Amino acid sequence: MKRININSQQTHFIGCWNLENNKLCNEIINLFENNKNLQIQGISDKGIDPKTKKTTDIPVSPNDLKKPKFEILKKYIGELHKCFLDYQNQWPFLKSMFNTLYVPSFNIQKYLPGDHFAALHSERTSINTSHRLFAWMTYLNDVDDGGQTNFSHYGIKINPETSKTLIWPAEWTHAHTGEVLKSGTKYIVTGWMHFPTSDEEIKQKK
């Protein structure tokens, strides 16, 4: 992976990289399109509400990564981990305090023209989500018209480009929107990193 600097006049704590293997992104798109039976209407913390979020998703659980069908996503998580290690190098405090985090279930998402995640949102908004520390996302294809990720508190808009990967704090400080896609198709894979919560995860940390 190659680190990308996001130009801003203020510190924003948004890590950005390009993955070296663009083929990986194409294979994840193929996985999505070849599994229509797994696709669901996009859900947010408000449930199914097209005014808040309008996408088509495939949810992926950690156990799914053990199945041959999802081998490509297991490889992807390995690439995401490399990005996180570089993120730690940029902020050494993370190495000493948060050396063990977990990736729970995540989504592959497809956007058609008119689709969006237009509601301003963050990933840590209640006691039920308080264990989330970071959010992450990889754009799986280039998008020419719309579909940017807008971190409005920082005046930062990220254009979707193949393999571009983001990691950012899950807090309200990094509330953002997924702007309306005006033409074409947009694919992403996205999820969270969290503190250990289950008994099994806590034992692994010890």
Predicted regions and their residues:
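Fe(II)/2-oxoglutarate oxygenase catalytic core
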Residues: 1-165, 173-206
